[in-house]
Amino acid sequence: MSLSGLRKQFNKANQYLSETMGAAEPTKLDDVFNEMEKNVDTTYNLITDLVAGTNEYLQPNPATRAKMATQVALSKVRGTTKTSPYPQTEGMLADVMQKYGQQLGDNSDLGKSLNDAAETYRQMADIKYQMEDNVKQNFLDPLTHLQNNELKDVNHHRTKLKGRRLDYDCKKRQQRRDDEMIQAEEKLEESKRLAEMSMFNVLSNDVEQISQLRALIEAQLDFHRQTAQCLENLQQQLGHRIKDAAARPREEHVPLSVLANESRTPRSSFRSPAPSDMSHNSTAAAAFKMPPQNGGGITQAPPSYQGPPPGGLPPPLSQQQKPQCRALFDFDAQSEGELDFKEGTLIELVSQIDENWYEGRVNGKTGLFPVTYVQVLVPLK
């Protein structure tokens, strides 16, 4: 910098300090110019915040945005241009649905429905990528161009105007020669005119900026139209899936026993008499009568068999007086101290342990068994 230029910068700094301290009064610009400056500052801040807000709307995850910015920086350092796209939430949801739809398989109606939904959400993710490209091309790029070019030129003229105004006020305060004052005044007027015209051009371009805002709305509207159509198609597909699943006959399922393929626990060697044996013994016993009390001989009744009474054979008289129950199901003892029996077995009740277990006796063997497996014939006293 030359000596004259250094002196000029020193004079400007001196004038600025004097104005700040209140020792000098700056040259006032007209109200129209001041209002235009205010509107330009507002426009600059508007574009800065609007671009940031739009990017956050398109890519809402800040951690992912930071990661992508780091990848872009590393790609520039390495000299590569390969970058991964922003992971859309619709695409991530589609991956989850497809994963479990494949695990359930084509035999599952739910699995096929999940695959249908995954395909639809993947289409929605592609549509959102198209919306991002559209918004970037027709909204973000024009705003960024306005900020980096027109507004940058406006601020350049404003900065130059401020410097020439300080130079003019400094020479005016120092009462320089007329030719220097005239030259400083001409430069001040020129800078003020350039700055004002550049601000006017930016502020009078509302039509273009409104058109850019409309492009943003149109891109969003087109996105929602296409995604709504995709969801309506998916809704119809799932309706058909529901009808097919409801029309299919319901399959019956019988659970397999845990011990179906294993040998059961060996039973006691004692075998309870078969119903036919019990019937034969009862018939044989009924063929004889006790001798009369007057000492007469034994009389034999003619053998006859009337068959078992309805509902099965009644227990002997001695058993009817004792608390007893009849087994409703087979019960296999699972631990020591339990009493196993077959369906229809008569069990002598010894005691009730609690609300879930009885203690009983069968063929001289005593043990525990569940209450729900038997029907009480003669209750405990």
Curated annotation (Swiss-Prot):
The record's GO CC annotations read: glutamatergic synapse; membrane; neuromuscular junction; presynapse; synaptic vesicle
Q: Which organism is it from?
A: Caenorhabditis elegans
Name the membrane topology term.
Answer: Peripheral membrane protein
Where does the UniProt annotation locate this protein?
Synapse; Cytoplasmic vesicle, Secretory vesicle, Synaptic vesicle; Membrane
Protein's job: Involved in synaptic vesicle (SV) recycling in neurons probably by regulating clathrin-mediated endocytosis. By controlling SV endocytosis, regulates the rate of excitatory postsynaptic currents (EPSCs) at neuromuscular junctions and thus locomotion. In a similar manner, involved in necrotic neuronal cell death induced by abnormal hyperactivation of ion channels. Plays a minor role in responses to mechanical stimuli. Plays a minor role in unc-26/synaptojanin localization to synapses.
Give positions of region: Membrane-binding amphipathic helix. 1-21
Claim: Cytoplasm is one of the keywords in the record: no
Query: Which protein is depicted?
Result: Endophilin-A homolog
Recorded hits in Gene3D superfamilies, A to Z, give: Arfaptin homology (AH) domain/BAR domain (1.20.1270.60), SH3 Domains (2.30.30.40)
- Subunit structure as annotated in this protein's UniProt entry: May form a homodimer (via the BAR domain).
Q: What is the lineage of its organism?
A: Eukaryota, Metazoa, Ecdysozoa, Nematoda, Chromadorea
Q: Which InterPro entries match?
A: AH/BAR_dom_sf, BAR_dom, Endophilin_A_SH3, Endophilin_SH3RF, SH3-like_dom_sf, SH3_domain
Annotated signal sequence range? none
SH3 domain sequence ranges: 320-379
Q: For the region Disordered, what residue ranges are annotated?
A: 246-323
